[in-house]
Amino acid sequence: EMCIRDSCGGVYPLGSDEIATKLSSVRALNEAKEKGQDLVTLCSACHHVIKRVNDDMRNVEDIRTRANNYMQLDEPYAGETNVLHYLEVLRDRVGFDELKKKVVNPLKGRKIGAYYGCLLLRPSTVLAFDDPENPQIIEDFIRAIGAEPVVYPYRNECCGGYISLKEKEMSGRMSCNIVDSAAGAGAEMLITACPLCMYNLNKSGSGKIPVYYFTELLAEALGVKEEALK
């Protein structure tokens, strides 16, 4: 097990000639490769950026060559590392049935809306995370910790993302629509797997229901003491 503290780069650059922004992701990917390990992240934005950069390093020769020329690694990196979101680890490695057996404090009676946003699901051909139109992984997670998932229309819509830095009013409207949609469908709270989404929904949303990170409820369901989280 290895902890990588490098930045993912923050945003996946859309310009085909933009290499420098991708190098921090390549560095993290190469570290995992050298250790012979998968790269697991808790953050949807990091997962999105790193997995797309990894796909570039596997499939786009020009980007791979230029990135390796910049990095000057002992051995060129060519996309060998497997990139996973922690939710994928829970689903595919641990298994939600096994997770359910470990729950000591089932969250019975709680009606929870899953907020996916856009970074976890798209582009689906690269991320291959879940069905981009009708994802189920977070709902399955909610069931595993003993709560009731609430499906609502805006769960896959963008929260405003990085435009919250410049267009606060627009981002606020987008976040409010999401929170209002979930509350209107009967959700008592929202969970997300993206720190930026959590920030936008809490700061710019309507405030009708609270928004939590999925790991907060996981810790509660597993009976993790609050002191252990500090």
Label every PLM stretch briefly.
Residues D38-E61:
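A basic- and aromatic-enriched beta-loop-alpha substructure that forms the phosphate/nucleotide-
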Residues N69-R93, G207-K230:
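Short, flexible loop segments at boundaries between secondary-structure elements
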